[in-house]
Amino acid sequence: MRILKPYLRSTSIQCYLCLLLNSHFLTEAGIHVFILGCISAGLPKTEANWQSVIHDLKTIEHLIQSMHMDATLYTESDAHPNCKVTALQCFLLELRVILHESKNAAIYEIIENLTMLADRNLSSIENKTELGCKECEELEKKSIKEFLKSFVHIVQMFINTS
């Protein structure tokens, strides 16, 4: 039998051992701790969300190619790893330009999903100020194709540091 989520098995075993070894966990509060521990072990990890962001970006690229959009967007092409959160926030703002220019329902759904996934991932990163990073308006304007390529690169920076 193949275990699809091996990290669940080890967490469950740890919870069982804790219950067995500590008799005071046999109270109602102990049972609540056990249940919440099991639930939290089953929550998805953020790495999967970043992969979904990349998938959504590639889908947007295919949709835009069929529409022949020629907008230019502020693009961070060589972001320093210390500025990746600032760069990602700029990319998310520029996605709104694509949304406005395309007026396409499919792109609207994808951008809303992508924004939600990215915001959820950003909220899990500690809120710190990144000094020396360029503001969005200071970035060079590039084609949508270059914008999406750079966006994927920034997301991969988040995956590599997770």
Curated annotation (Swiss-Prot):
Protein name stated in the entry: Interleukin-15
UniProt feature coiled coil, ranges: none
Protein family membership: Belongs to the IL-15/IL-21 family.
Annotated GO biological process: immune response; interleukin-15-mediated signaling pathway; neutrophil activation; positive regulation of cytokine production; positive regulation of immune response; positive regulation of peptidyl-tyrosine phosphorylation; positive regulation of phagocytosis; positive regulation of T cell proliferation
High-level lineage: Eukaryota, Metazoa, Chordata, Craniata, Vertebrata
UniProt function note: Cytokine that plays a major role in the development of inflammatory and protective immune responses to microbial invaders and parasites by modulating immune cells of both the innate and adaptive immune systems. Stimulates the proliferation of natural killer cells, T-cells and B-cells and promotes the secretion of several cytokines. In monocytes, induces the production of IL8 and monocyte chemotactic protein 1/CCL2, two chemokines that attract neutrophils and monocytes respectively to sites of infection.
A GO cellular component annotation in the UniProt record: extracellular space
Cysteines joined through disulfide linkages: 83-133, 90-136
Organism: Ovis aries (Sheep)
The UniProt record lists the keyword Disulfide bond: yes
